[in-house]
């Protein structure tokens, strides 16, 4: 895939993996620490690689790296160093690539690695990524994101997954951090009812502004209730870009207990997912609470 190129999906649907942090937790990782799933990059890299491999074996075409919550600022807040943060960022891509190569050798599959770029609120670990009101300027957000994007891109991912964006302001700040050349990116928002972002922006107005960036290859939603996905895709379809649909399994973040309280570890409904494809979704997967078994069922339904 040429640097700076748009991801040519055509009519092909690629299955994205599920909830990485929730799957790590289900396999014994302690996510109560301030660094959440990023802690496993330092303390349990073999487990990180194993989770990626499990999703690939289940039928995922794309692995999203465990870098969602990795940043210099976040690591310093947790008593770590900038060097630790850079190590974790590079390792997140390397471990996903190792898993892709391992499963390719077994099955002949051609898995892609998407480097996760999560919202600034994930660093604060207080749930503020669910509304995007950080008290930070656009320039400050761009500088924050640029610092880690440079390291991630140097590690050689196939894509960037700019995910769980609560507002258009932060999404545009991330895009301002991108150089002209680099891997294609998808941008996915956390959406709520009636085609709005979690921060209250109308996706119909947001879409064209994001899609205009030359490195944006797809646009959509993640970490969104299944019932709210269709309206979001309808709002974003006029961009003409391939759409992203990666809903969660339902639940709420417990900021005190520092864990998810799931309504149930349900699967992405395969029948609903085929309707999303009809709406233009070409990257379909899951988010929090969606595990490898769920992705296997989804992959079979979309095959």
Q: Predicted segment positions?
A:
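Domain-level signal for soluble alpha/beta catalytic cores
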Residues: 1-303
């Amino acid at each position: 895939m040429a640097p700076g190129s748009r991801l040519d999906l055509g009519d092909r649907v690629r299955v994205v993996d599920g909830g990485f942090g929730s799957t790590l937790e289900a396999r014994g990782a302690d996510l109560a620490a301030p660094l959440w799933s990023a802690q496993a990059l330092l303390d349990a890299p073999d487990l990180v690689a194993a989770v990626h491999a499990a999703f690939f074996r289940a039928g995922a075409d794309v692995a999203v790296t465990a870098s969602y919550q990795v940043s210099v600022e976040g690591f310093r807040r947790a008593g770590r160093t900038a060097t630790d943060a850079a190590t974790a960022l590079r390792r997140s891509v390397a471990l996903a690539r190792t898993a892709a190569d391992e499963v390719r050798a077994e099955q002949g599959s051609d898995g892609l690695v998407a480097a996760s770029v999560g919202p600034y609120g994930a660093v604060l670990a207080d749930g503020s990524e669910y509304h995007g009101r950080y008290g930070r300027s656009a320039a400050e957000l761009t500088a924050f994101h640029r610092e880690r994007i440079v390291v991630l891109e140097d590690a050689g991912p196939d894509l960037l997954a700019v995910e769980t964006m609560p507002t258009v302001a932060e999404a545009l700040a991330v895009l301002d951090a991108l150089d002209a050349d680099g891997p294609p990116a998808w941008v996915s928002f956390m959406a709520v009812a009636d085609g709005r972002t979690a921060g209250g922006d109308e996706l119909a107005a947001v879409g064209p502004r994001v899609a205009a960036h030359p490195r944006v290859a797809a646009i959509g939603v993640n970490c969104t209730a299944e019932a709210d996905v269709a309206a979001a895709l309808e709002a974003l379809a006029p961009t003409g870009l391939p759409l992203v649909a990666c809903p969660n399994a339902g639940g709420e973040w417990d900021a005190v207990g520092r864990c998810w309280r799931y309504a149930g570890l349900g699967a992405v409904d395969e029948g609903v997912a085929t309707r999303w494809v009809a709406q233009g979704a070409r990257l379909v997967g899951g988010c929090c609470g969606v595990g490898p078994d769920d992705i296997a069922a989804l992959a079979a339904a979309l095959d």
